[in-house]
UniProtKB/Swiss-Prot annotation:
Protein name: Large ribosomal subunit protein uL4
Source superkingdom: Bacteria
InterPro entries, A to Z: Ribosomal_uL4 (IPR002136), Ribosomal_uL4-like (IPR013005), Ribosomal_uL4_dom_sf (IPR023574)
One function term, GO molecular function aspect: rRNA binding
Any one Gene Ontology cellular component term annotated for this protein: ribonucleoprotein complex
Region (Disordered), start-end ranges: 44-71
Organism: Photorhabdus laumondii subsp. laumondii (strain DSM 15139 / CIP 105565 / TT01)
Cysteine disulfide links: none
Biological processes annotated in GO: translation
Keywords: Ribonucleoprotein, Ribosomal protein, RNA-binding, rRNA-binding
Family classification: Belongs to the universal ribosomal protein uL4 family.
Amino acid sequence: MELVMKDAQGALTVSETTFGRDFNEALVHQVVVAYAAGARQGTRAQKTRAEVSGSGKKPWRQKGTGRARSGSIKSPIWRSGGVTFAAKPQDHSQKVNKKMYRGALKSILSELVRQDRLIVVEKFSVEAPKTKLLVQKLKEMALEDVLIITNEVDENLFLAARNLYKVDVRDVAGIDPVSLIAFDKVVMTADAVKQVEEMLA
């Protein structure tokens, strides 16, 4: 199959297994959920009644004071007491096989082509690390919410995009399923397309 290049005459011949396969929604969902789960810190921690600071002595005798009976100042119903079901640090990551991960990326890229959300260009760069220059370039291409993928990160382009909320610049090694889905359009250079094909082959 062929992908038409926006800034040059002609088209780029690409593999149908990477850019023309059916959309596997279940697989994409599983991989996206696993990717998001892997990004969770999982470091929250609370103290149980056994871990909270304080004496183990009974605050007052069982009977005769007129007050409600109490056995510990560390009880969860007391102020500064422990937490009943205290949260502990945990690993939220989910296992995803390489074949599944690659399959999900191929599925997403194919769907981007079908929806005309993937734009292939010969080259994408700016002359200086100025946000103004990048905004102007994107305006000419009628792009606003966009992920730009190059075969290697251009420092000028990276610095120019850093201050734009709806624009991100990545190299091929930095692409992930969540980013590919999150942006309205994805711009890829011809070299990046070839590199993606090699990576997912």
